[in-house]
């Protein structure tokens, strides 16, 4: 809730801070979901590597289950997905850190401006 006696500038800064906070939360959620997906892919890859090459392997696509003919191709695809997910996670982490830094800077700027406005109001 925005106080009615603060300047329009401060109200705008507070809205920006709120938007940054929401974006940080969204990125954290995306990172969490990707991290879960990455762990699942790594576990799947570990299990695939334990299997003998002659063991039948099945894969689901949507609601369809089909037999995989080429285990190596499946392992390679999974490796590629893991690498892409790691890159995406790294990118999201950098974005989140950047937004967190901007948020801290904005918090400090808001605090300073609020204190300045209160000093002016107290001396008037």
Swiss-Prot record:
Q: Which Gene3D superfamilies match?
A: 1.10.287.370
Name the domain of life: Archaea
* Entry keyword Cytoplasm: yes
- Cite a GO CC annotation: cytoplasm
Which GO biological process entries does UniProt record here? protein folding
Classify the main location. cytoplasm
Extract one GO molecular function annotation from the record. Answer: unfolded protein binding
Subcellular localization(s) per the UniProt record: Cytoplasm
Q: Which UniProt keywords apply?
A: Chaperone, Cytoplasm
Family under the similarity heading: Belongs to the prefoldin subunit beta family.
What is this protein's function per UniProt? Molecular chaperone capable of stabilizing a range of proteins. Seems to fulfill an ATP-independent, HSP70-like function in archaeal de novo protein folding.
Q: What is this protein called?
A: Prefoldin subunit beta
The gene coding this protein: pfdB
């Amino acid at each position: 809730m925005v106080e009615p006696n603060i300047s329009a500038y401060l109200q705008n800064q507070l809205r920006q801070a709120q938007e940054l906070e929401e974006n940080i939360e969204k990125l954290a959620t995306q990172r969490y979901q990707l991290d879960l997906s990455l762990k699942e892919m790594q576990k799947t890859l570990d299990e695939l590597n334990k299997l003998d090459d002659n063991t039948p392997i099945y894969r689901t696509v949507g609601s369809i289950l089909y037999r995989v003919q080429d285990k190596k191709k499946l392992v390679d695809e999974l490796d590629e997905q893991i690498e892409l997910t790691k890159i995406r996670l790294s990118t999201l982490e950098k974005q989140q850190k950047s937004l967190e830094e901007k948020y801290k800077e904005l918090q400090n700027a808001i605090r300073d401006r609020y204190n300045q406005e209160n000093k002016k109001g107290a001396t008037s």
